[in-house]
C-alpha cells in the first residue's frame, strides 16, 4: 500500500464539473493499493496517518497532528502510484490491485479514518477526476506500508 500525503490548505475533487469532495485544512491522500495488500495494511496506514505530526506548532516545529488542528481528509484512489517505470517508456501497473478488491480496501481505509473521528471526503473510485489543491508548504510524504 502506498499513500501520498499532502498537507493542504484546501482541496477538492470534481467529476463532470460537479464537486464530489471538498475539504479545508488537512490532508489530501492519494491511495494506491498493491496486489497482496490486506486489511492489516489498511489499518496500519490509517493509524500512522492519524498520528502523523506534520503541522506546525506555535514555535514553528512540525509537532501537531491532524486532530490537533481539527483537520479534514480528502481521500482519492489512485492505482497509478504503483507504476513500474524500470523498463521502457510505458509504465506497467501489474503491481496495482484490481477491482473489486481494491475498491473494497480503499473503502475500508476511509472507514478506518472515519472511525478515528476524522471528517473524510472522497473522490469516486475508478472515475476520471480533476483534483485541485492548495499545498501548504509544500509538505508531501510518501507512506509505504
From Swiss-Prot:
Its EC number is 3.1.1.96. Homodimer. It is found in: Cytoplasm. An aminoacyl-tRNA editing enzyme that deacylates mischarged D-aminoacyl-tRNAs. Also deacylates mischarged glycyl-tRNA(Ala), protecting cells against glycine mischarging by AlaRS. Acts via tRNA-based rather than protein-based catalysis; rejects L-amino acids rather than detecting D-amino acids in the active site. By recycling D-aminoacyl-tRNA to D-amino acids and free tRNA molecules, this enzyme counteracts the toxicity associated with the formation of D-aminoacyl-tRNA entities in vivo and helps enforce protein L-homochirality. This is D-aminoacyl-tRNA deacylase. PANTHER family: D-AMINOACYL-TRNA DEACYLASE 1, D-TYROSYL-TRNA TYR DEACYLASE. GO terms for biological process: D-amino acid catabolic process. Keywords: Cytoplasm, Hydrolase, RNA-binding, tRNA-binding. The keyword Ion transport does not apply. InterPro entries: Daa-tRNA_deacyls_DTD, DTD-like_sf. Belongs to the DTD family. SUPFAM superfamilies: DTD-like. It comes from Lactobacillus gasseri (strain ATCC 33323 / DSM 20243 / BCRC 14619 / CIP 102991 / JCM 1131 / KCTC 3163 / NCIMB 11718 / NCTC 13722 / AM63). The keyword Transmembrane does not apply. It catalyses: glycyl-tRNA(Ala) + H2O = tRNA(Ala) + glycine + H(+); a D-aminoacyl-tRNA + H2O = a tRNA + a D-alpha-amino acid + H(+).
Amino acid at each position: 500500500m502506498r499513500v501520498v500525503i499532502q498537507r493542504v490548505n484546501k482541496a477538492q475533487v470534481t467529476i463532470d464539473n460537479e464537486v464530489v469532495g471538498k475539504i479545508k485544512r488537512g490532508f489530501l491522500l492519494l491511495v494506491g493499493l498493491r496486489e497482496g495488500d490486506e486489511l492489516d495494511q489498511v489499518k496500519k496506514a490509517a493509524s500512522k496517518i492519524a498520528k502523523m505530526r506534520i503541522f506546525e506548532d506555535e514555535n514553528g516545529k512540525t509537532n501537531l497532528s491532524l486532530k490537533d488542528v481539527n483537520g479534514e481528509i480528502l481521500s482519492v484512489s489512485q492505482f497509478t502510484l504503483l507504476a513500474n517505470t524500470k523498463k521502457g517508456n510505458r509504465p506497467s501497473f501489474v503491481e496495482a490491485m484490481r477491482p473489486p478488491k481494491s475498491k473494497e480496501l480503499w473503502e475500508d481505509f476511509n472507514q478506518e479514518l472515519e472511525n478515528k473521528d476524522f471528517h473524510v471526503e472522497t473522490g469516486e473510485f475508478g472515475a476520471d477526476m480533476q483534483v485541485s489543491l492548495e499545498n501548504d508548504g509544500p509538505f508531501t510524504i510518501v507512506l509505504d506500508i
